[in-house]
Amino acid sequence: RDAQESRGLGDVYKRQPYEMAEYLARDLTMLQEINPDTISLSPFVPREGTSFRHQLPCNLETFLRLTAILRVMFPKANIAASPLVNSIHVQGQVMAIYSGANVLRVPLFPPPVPGVTRRSGGVSLLRRLQSLYASLSSHNYEMVVDRGDSLRFLERHPKAPAQKN
């Protein structure tokens, strides 16, 4: 393991089919043991063609509550809000920021859609980024594009490259 490696945890999907409260409690206990620098949180959203296509999606309130719980448990970790939360609510990622997430994952390229050129897809992505920026700025949040080291990582590695602001 590299001495400057950040400890991250892959996607934590919430409100999975058949999930029970004790599973969530076990997951949170495991997270405390791992004590990750980064937690990527994604809601469960059913998809056609899968065995769970008829299951209910994650409730937005549940997702936001879990985001807030993770922020209290891990005040110095990066908590990433997946763009998938926008399929539950159009402002899902922004609401996740208000609930404690501090990283927005934004796809670099929009998904391929028949009849949409890469240029018009890029314009759509630019509009989405501008909308995110405006929404966050209106609530005194600053959106930056940088390396994204967590506060825990920077405390352990004070000579790590400084973040750009």
Kindly give the residue locations of the regions a language model identified.
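Single conserved hydrophobic/aromatic residue that forms the stacking wall/gate
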Residues: 1-9, 13
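Residues within alpha-helical segments
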Residues: 1-4, 28, 97
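Extended alpha-helical regions
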Residues: 7, 25-32, 45
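Active-site-proximal beta-alpha loop/turn segments in soluble metabolic enzymes
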Residues: 10-19, 47-53
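Active-site glycine- and acidic-residue-rich loops that bind
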Residues: 14-28, 83-90
